[in-house]
Structures are given as structure tokens and as C-alpha cells.
């Protein structure tokens, strides 16, 4: 497969399964497509862990079986939760032409990132000889060879002699493995194309979702659509995601950051749309299963939103709103328990990989305000984008 066509197929594998689940959950097409990748990751997460424990191989057919099972479950839950649907609120969704405007901005941002990938990836069917890139490609190969895709069974790959238990988030790789089976691509090719697809789509769409969530309550539909489209296009200009994240081969981390914002927005919408709770649980499971850091980004956003907004503007009363959020959090924690236990068993190993920066608290705050990290030391600070961001924050 070629880079452009292969990326298109990878986008379909990433977006389509979750979009089907979202439509079953009665989400509109724009919302379903935006949250689709997070739900896809959630479906994969709920498949690979029990499959690994039961010895069921992960492949295209078992992935399809997991999707069908989740679709049936979501259908049943929607029938049970139908009485909680807020049809009046649903009627306030985005109109057709404003949605087209937003889609144009998302597509422009995606094309700009794709063009950068086309110009920058000269040997895209192979991977660089860095530990992370080689590990990710090997993990895809391991899944294709053995059918074992569970995050809690990665010790079978990492610890060849002892097979000592090891937790490593493998949802991203499981999606890439299905892509390889569908297209016949090599593991290195599938890994690269899946990474490009995540980079191309998740950040423009995530920027659009967050901007719409912030602007629409305080602005008219067309103005919100224009600002949202602009933000989606500008998302291709930030250095850290996806470019530097892609360059250091932090692909699960990249994908988790990309689906964190749509998941956050979906969870906030459950206060008014309680029938979306199952979809929110599935999306949050997906984010945590791709990489734990993405899940903690969601939690930080939720805490900020609750303390700065929802606490003072409850939808159904503070206790009722807390109960709704708890209905999302508790099932998520129960589903993720095996993965959390796996991480806790590796606490000493994780501590051994600490990277002290030796920066003062003051310098840390300055770096945060300037959107700077150690990986960006070789790049200039994007003062123009920073100023625009803070100007928008001041206006809001």
C-alpha cells in the first residue's frame, strides 16, 4: 500500500468501529465521528484483555466478534436508558452547514499534517533504530505471530527467557495488527501508517471538539463554527503534538492525548444526556487502555471543569451531577482493575525510569505557560500561538 492510501485505510480502521458504536448510542454523526477513535480503542481494550486471559487469539475475526458483542450490549443499554434521553437538548446540536464549516477546518488541519508526513517520512515502510520504534513494531509482529494482544501479557515478548509478567498498554498495537491483517502490510508499515493516521486525525478533530465545547455556550452557532474550524486548522501548527511526539516514537502516548479531549467532552455531556453514560465509560476505558497518561489528562480536565464551571452551574443539582459522573467513573475503574493492578506490580520498575529535570518550580511554571517541554529544546517557542491561546482564554 502507498502512504496516502494506506493512511486512508488506517483512518477507516481507527474511526469506523467506534462511529458504529456511537451511532447505536444515538449520538449525531458529527459527534459520533469525533468520538469514534476513543470508542474504537475502548472496544479493542474490552476484547484483548479477556481474549488474552482465555487464550483466544486476536485477529480480524475476533476483533469483529468483539465489535458485534459491544454493539449488542450498547443496543440493550440504549433501550434501558431511552427514558433518560433529553430530546430538547439534542435539538440544539450543530446544524448542517455549520457542521460542514467545522469539517472543512478539520480536513484542512489533517491535510497539513499529512503533507508534513509525506514530505518528512522518506523511508516510511521501515522504522528508525530507536528502542521505542523497534519495540512498537515488534509488538505488532508478536500479535500477528502469536495472537496474544493483552496488555497484561507483554512479558511474553519483553522477557523472552522468563516470561515474567509485564503490563504494557497494547491497544494501539492491536489496532495496527488488525490493519496489517486487512491489508497484508508488514508490521513496520502497519505501525507507521497507524501512527500517521492517529497524528493526522486526532489533533484537528480534538481541537475542534474542545473549541466547540468552549465557544458554543457563549456564542452563536455560526461564530462558534468559524472559530472551531480555525482552531482545527491551526492545530497543525503546534510542534509538540503530533510532530515531536511522533519523532520520539511515543505513539501510544500520542494516541491517548489525541482521544483525551473528545472523551472529556463526552463525559461532561452526560450531565444532560444521561443515556450517553455507557458510551462515556467505553471511551474512558479506551483512553486509559491506550496509555495511562491520556486518562490522567482527562481527569485533570474534568477536575478543572468541575471546579471552575460545573460546581457553580449544576445541570440537575450538584448531588445528581456527582452521581452521574460516578456512574461513569465506577464502571470504568472496575473494567480497568486488571490493568491498574499490573501497573502497581511494576511500581519499582517505573520508578527506576525516572527522569529528573533539575529545574526549579519557577522554571517549571514558565515552561508550562509557554507550552514547552524538554523534547522541544531544539525548537523555538511558538510565541504567536501562545499569545493567541491566552488572548482566547482572556476573552472567554
Task: Describe the predicted segments one by one.
Residues 1-99:
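Membrane-embedded, hydrophobic transmembrane alpha-helices
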Residues 4-14, 256-257, 357-396:
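Alpha-helical transmembrane segments at the extracellular/periplasmic loop-to-helix junctions
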Residues 95-96, 218-224, 312-325, 393-396:
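Membrane-interface helix-loop-helix junctions at transmembrane boundaries of multi-pass membrane enzymes
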Residues 99-108, 282-284, 302, 315-341:
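Hydrophobic alpha-helical membrane-interfacial segments at the cytosolic entry of transmembrane helices
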Residues 108-258:
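Active-site lumenal/periplasmic loops and adjacent helix-entry segments of GT-C-fold
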Residues 260-278:
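Membrane-interface transmembrane helices that cradle and orient dolichyl/undecaprenyl
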Residues 266, 277-292:
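Membrane-interface alpha helices of multi-pass inner-membrane proteins
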Residues 286, 298-312:
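Hydrophobic transmembrane alpha-helices of multi-pass, membrane-embedded glycosylation machinery
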